[in-house]
């Protein structure tokens, strides 16, 4: 159900963005995170997938921090588009 809601956004992203761009990678990681989160509602003790989720969260966080340092405008636009929280500043 989560996968179907992102199909129009994916098609727009593929036309406009390079698959290697930071925005596209963050978008794909966010998709995976949402799919895994819905998976954990049924399979609470799937610890291997929980580890994978933590790894994906870390990768997305590193990409977002890179983007926020390089271009704040693109970072804010991406955060609003994906409806995710802004990272805390250390």
From Swiss-Prot:
UniProt xrefs under Gene3D superfamilies: S15/NS1, RNA-binding
Coiled coil: none
SUPFAM superfamilies per the UniProt record, alphabetical: S15/NS1 RNA-binding domain
Superkingdom in the source lineage: Eukaryota
Pfam families: Ribosomal_S15
Keyword Transcription regulation (UniProt): no
Cellular compartments annotated: Plastid, Chloroplast
UniProt entry tagged with the keyword Oxidoreductase: no
Residues annotated as transmembrane: none
CDD domains, alphabetized: S15_NS1_EPRS_RNA-bind (cd00677)
Main localization (coarse): plastid
Cellular component, GO, one term: ribosome
Keywords: Chloroplast, Plastid, Ribonucleoprotein, Ribosomal protein
Single biological process term from Gene Ontology: translation
GO molecular function, one term: structural constituent of ribosome
Family (UniProt): Belongs to the universal ribosomal protein uS15 family.
Subunit structure: Part of the 30S ribosomal subunit.
Protein name per UniProt: Small ribosomal subunit protein uS15c
Species of the source: Lotus japonicus (Lotus corniculatus var. japonicus)
Organism phylogeny: Eukaryota, Viridiplantae, Streptophyta, Embryophyta, Tracheophyta
């Amino acid at each position: 159900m989560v996968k179907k809601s992102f199909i129009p956004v994916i098609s727009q992203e593929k036309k406009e963005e390079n698959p290697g761009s930071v925005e596209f990678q963050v978008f794909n990681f966010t998709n995976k995170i949402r799919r895994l989160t819905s998976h954990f509602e049924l399979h609470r003790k799937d610890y291997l997938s929980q580890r994978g989720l933590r790894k994906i969260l870390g990768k997305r966080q590193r990409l977002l921090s890179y983007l926020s340092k390089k271009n704040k405008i693109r970072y804010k636009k991406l955060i609003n588009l994906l409806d995710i929280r802004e990272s805390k500043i250390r």
